[in-house]
UniProtKB/Swiss-Prot annotation:
It is an enzyme of class 3 (hydrolase). Keywords: Autophagy, Cytoplasm, Hydrolase, Lipid metabolism, Protease, Protein transport, Thiol protease, Transport, Ubl conjugation pathway. Its main location: cytoplasm. The LIR motif (LC3-interacting region) is required for the interaction with the ATG8 family proteins. Required for proteolytic activation and delipidation of ATG8 proteins. GO terms for biological process: aggrephagy; autophagosome assembly; autophagy; lipid metabolic process; mitophagy; piecemeal microautophagy of the nucleus; protein delipidation; protein processing. Interacts with ATG9A; the interaction is direct. GO terms for molecular function: cysteine-type endopeptidase activity; cysteine-type peptidase activity; protein-phosphatidylethanolamide deconjugating activity. Belongs to the peptidase C54 family. It catalyses: [protein]-C-terminal L-amino acid-glycyl-phosphatidylethanolamide + H2O = [protein]-C-terminal L-amino acid-glycine + a 1,2-diacyl-sn-glycero-3-phosphoethanolamine. It is found in: Cytoplasm. This is Cysteine protease ATG4A.
Length: 398
């Protein structure tokens, strides 16, 4: 009996207690691009939040690297937040933003496959093992705390080995998103066998137009766009607050990574000037697949009251996430950014059409030549030499 209780520790299923955490207000709550009216849609809000995959500290998994830690308690919170953001992208990719999880009901096979990407085993492509060991290539020792930018770089590199989800991961640099580079990456990486990879972007675009409306979609690799930012020096500059909140309203929103120094949260929305977040700082026991090949998912959804914090208490180091399944989604995102973000006198980030001339040439990332495939390749830190270290992002002018 004690083992059963331990398995489901920290799970609170009394919905009334959950909803009492929200004030009685006419204000809208925004969660990852969807709005909820508290007075009339509290149960829908609850369902929407609890449907997000929730990754927390775990214990009793196999030692990382064979001899490393068997728990990430105290150091893995930003890695868990990165997992949550990526998992939301995969849910949108395979099941759609409107899909909802229901407790103790059979879930789609795609859902189970997504969940298994994140189990705490070295053979799972986005496990704590893979992320921690890939972090060595970013200058982070196993067991060391990661910042938002480091997690973004790790996800970008691990995604190269994930053939099933087939994501193009773009991490902006110098607070600048380059439209030309993203379209080059997403189109090039998903070309059909009869389309030469070396064809220029203009030629590819013309070819797609001649083939009809469906060709453009089939030539687009789903995009995970991560924008690391520093919105101040020691604290967030209030001038960025409105633009930051606007990002949670965008249909492409995957929320934000951030929190406080050495204390990471996954921000999924806001109410007024309070950010709503999922907190990874709960230590649960490692969950593995069962005999039927599925994993018990009851501890991977947060049924506790959602936590909130005033946006001005946020550490200025953050990373915004967006998912664009099709090219039209990215085009729509660009329009929203131009309308809501670039209108500010002090812009949170820049969106430019062309690759800056003073930057090195853009080369779409490619999987290194290694002797194994998939997640198994990162069995030791020596195999990380194929990757170049990424520089940290710059501080925005304030």
């Amino acid at each position: 009996m004690e083992s059963v209780l331990s398995k489901y520790e920290n799970q609170i299923t009394i919905f009334a207690d959950y909803l009492e955490e929200f004030p009685d207000t006419d204000e809208l709550v925004w969660i990852l691009g969807k709005q909820h009216l508290l007075k009339t849609e509290k149960s829908k809000l609850l369902s929407d939040i609890s449907a997000r995959l929730w990754f927390t500290y775990r214990r009793k998994f196999s030692p990382i690297g064979g001899t490393g830690p068997s728990s990430d308690a105290g150091w893995g919170c930003m890695l868990r937040c990165g997992q949550m953001m990526l998992a939301q992208a995969l849910i949108c990719r395979h099941l759609g933003r409107d899909w909802n999880w229901e407790k103790q009901k059979e879930q789609p096979k795609e859902y189970q496959r997504i969940l298994q990407c994140f189990l705490d085993r070295k053979d799972c492509c986005y496990s704590i093992h893979q992320m921690a060991q890939m972090g060595v290539g970013e200058g982070k020792s196993i067991g060391e705390w990661f910042g938002p930018n480091t997690v973004a770089q790790v996800l970008k590199k691990l995604a190269l080995f994930d053939e099933w989800n087939s994501l193009a991961v773009y991490v902006s640099m110098d607070n600048t998103v380059v439209i030309e580079d993203i379209k080059k990456m997403c189109r090039t990486l998903s070309l059909s066998a009869d389309t030469p990879a070396e064809r220029p972007l203009e030629s590819l675009t013309a070819s797609n137009q001649s083939k009809g409306p469906s060709a453009c979609c089939t030539a687009w690799k789903p995009l995970l766009l991560i924008v690391p930012l520093r919105l101040g020096i020691n604290q967030i500059n209030p001038v960025y607050v409105d633009a930051f909140k606007e990002c949670f309203k965008m249909p492409q929103s995957l929320g934000a990574l951030g929190g406080k120094p050495n204390n990471a949260y996954y921000f999924i929305g806001f109410l007024g000037d309070e950010l709503i977040f999922l907190d990874p700082h709960t230590t649960q026991t490692f969950v593995d697949t069962e005999e039927n090949g599925t994993a018990d998912d009851q501890t991977f959804h947060c049924l506790q009251p959602p936590q909130r914090m005033n946006i001005l208490n946020l550490d200025p180091s953050v990373a915004l996430g967006f998912f664009c399944k099709e090219e039209k989604d990215f085009d729509s995102w660009c329009s929203l950014v131009q309308k809501e973000i670039l209108k500010e006198n002090l812009r949170m980030f820049e969106l430019v059409q062309k690759h800056p001339s003073h930057w090195p040439p853009f080369v779409p990332p490619a999987k290194p030549e290694v002797t194994t495939t998939g997640a198994e390749f990162i069995d030791s830190t020596e195999q990380l030499e194929e990757f170049d270290l990424e520089e940290d992002f710059e501080i925005l002018s304030i």
